[in-house]
Amino acid sequence: MQLEIKVALNFIISYLYNKLPRRRADLFGEELERLLKKKYEGHWYPEKPLKGSGFRCVHIGEMVDPVVELAAKRSGLAVEDVRANVPEELSVWIDPFEVSYQIGEKGAVKVLYLDDSEGCGAPELDKEIKSSFNPDAQVFVPIGSQDSSLSNSPSPSFGQSPSPTFIPRSAQPITFTTASFAATKFGSTKMKKGGGAASGGGVASSGAGGQQPPQQPRMARSPTNSLLKHKSLSLSMHSLNFITANPAPQSQLSPNAKEFVYNGGGSPSLFFDAADGQGSGTPGPFGGSGAGTCNSSSFDMAQVFGGGANSLFLEKTPFVEGLSYNLNTMQYPSQQFQPVVLAN
């Protein structure tokens, strides 16, 4: 009796899944099983299977079986919801060794379960059972022969576990081979667009061995930073009023300022007005020869940056560090500076 009730309940509950709350549908099945077992006590005749068949029939339609109404009430479902989600005029006969159903008053009677001990008519019933399978009922699997045991059946046992009883069949774990997993998106070995060439080159270079990756090009020094340095240098020179007539010897030249070349070239002095005199044609103390002299109004750059006893600044290497520009060709920002005239 327990097996036949399970088959009938799984068929009915399969229509409620995905339409009503799953937990409520499970509770409805548990309550209906309990009530049917109690109802069939004393009305189950294995020796005469057809005896009391009308009494054991479960009908859901315009007239709903009182057992179904009570099970819906106890599980928190409305009878109208149960009736609206099952086929119209559904009748299920639960008899010893056989479970069948009918949809509609004039519908054909189809077999859900038949325990044929002698084995006659089993192949024909298999086709009938498959054709009567509910496609929306992924949980329900009809039982076609006696060889199907309870352990293999997806029908749960009510009352044995507090968890939901109508559990869908568990999906088989998906296994991958190395080749099949590599073909998936997660295991794809293809390079992304834009980085394939670089990545391929890196792999090739690592495979060849001994080849160093190409160095990144150095960033060019910003001319703005250099102009700012020149600006600070010129302003600091304009503010000086320390002038000496004796040029400093070659040995007192700062090693960091050897690249700094001052070319007078007969042009007006950078730091003095034309009234103070023109610079001589000979190179200044920063020239390549290092032996030239200046007039009385010349500006002794080596004395300032050299580090002698009369030097105003002992060490000012940050002003001239890294400079390799000619003062005559030096380009200043667009802002115009007024020349400063130093009085004798």
Curated annotation (Swiss-Prot):
Transcription regulation found in the keyword field: no
Segments of this protein annotated with the region Disordered: 144-169, 191-225
PROSITE patterns: BTG_1, BTG_2
Expression by tissue: Ubiquitous.
Broad class of where this protein is predominantly found: cytoplasm
Subcellular location, record wording: Cytoplasm
Alphabetical UniProt keywords: Cytoplasm, Phosphoprotein
Residues modified to Phosphoserine: 254
InterPro entries: Anti_prolifrtn, BTG-like_sf, PAM2_motif, Tob1/2
Swiss-Prot/TrEMBL GO biological process terms: female gamete generation; negative regulation of cell population proliferation; negative regulation of osteoclast differentiation; osteoclast differentiation; positive regulation of ossification; regulation of gene expression
A GO CC term assigned to this protein in UniProt: nucleus
Bias type Gly residues, positions: 194-210
Molecular function as annotated in GO: nuclear vitamin D receptor binding; transcription corepressor activity
Biased composition annotated in UniProt, kind: Low complexity: 145-164, 211-225
Functional note: Anti-proliferative protein inhibits cell cycle progression from the G0/G1 to S phases.
Family the entry assigns: Belongs to the BTG family.
Self-association state and partner proteins as the record states: Associates with CAF1.
Protein name: Protein Tob2
Gene: TOB2
